[in-house]
């Protein structure tokens, strides 16, 4: 295994507020999927050239973190030190979901795509706050999703927007009307898998990881065909040999005071715990278009509070991992903390 040592508002002076209303979230709403289209959203086809050049695009926000480098750096100068103190709310948009919002809007030619908890998607006029369309996902029987019902946003590619769902699906919607085009089951939600991260669109593929590290899942990052929803590749964030090198120091050189002898005895007794070791990925990967590499950070091992039953370094938890964009093949990794 190789080590990774290095890795490489929009519509003007506008402040907006998007919030929930007092409408309760009921079971019948979870079981009903529907798209309400007030009028089609006037959006252009979002090309790969546009997505690749997002870092210098001061008109749109085409990625959750503004660009493939995930820097959140915006080069526009319309809002600056001299006028930021004068900004005032321009409009308020009320959703029908009473939960927190942890989403980043995607903005294309003045059309703002916003997600809410429990997998609603709204297309909104960024200038007026008026709704173009509203999609409600039909939720399956989910009882084990981790850490709340939040959703962190959509990806956009050509004429579609993409969202991961709490019941571990990837859905593709018509960017103009919100109509469901296809949906793909990513994993079994009853085994603890769920989706809250925003997908990433690149080179005709939709990249997405998974939640569920607290439920003993085996984490992954997967690529799906943007047109059909078919699986292109799968990378397990926990390899079949998760033991590693029995590291005694973390990435900063600090002694972790591991009892290696006790861990090796546990390995002999319990075996490699790779099938239930966790390793979720819920933040967007960085993409290097020149080298065709995808970089992502893998989360905690499972169970997170009892390391005695997961001997070894617990690869690739608590690590930065790089894979090939076209194939999903392992390139390198750097583990910050072994056996966390």
How would you name each of these model-derived features?
Residues 61-65, 100-120, 145-169, 194-218, ...:
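Repeat-blade elements of multi-bladed beta-propeller folds
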Residues 30-89, 247-260:
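Blade/loop signatures of beta-propeller domains
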Residues 125-128, 174-177, 226-228, 325-327:
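Short loop/turn segments that connect beta-strands within beta-propeller blades
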Residues 10-20:
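Bacterial N-terminal signal peptides
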Residues 22-26:
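Boundary at the C-terminal end of the N-terminal hydrophobic targeting segment
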Residues 76-86, 116-137, 312, 325:
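Beta-propeller domains
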Residues 93-104, 134-155, 183-198, 236-284, ...:
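Extracytoplasmic beta-rich repeat domains
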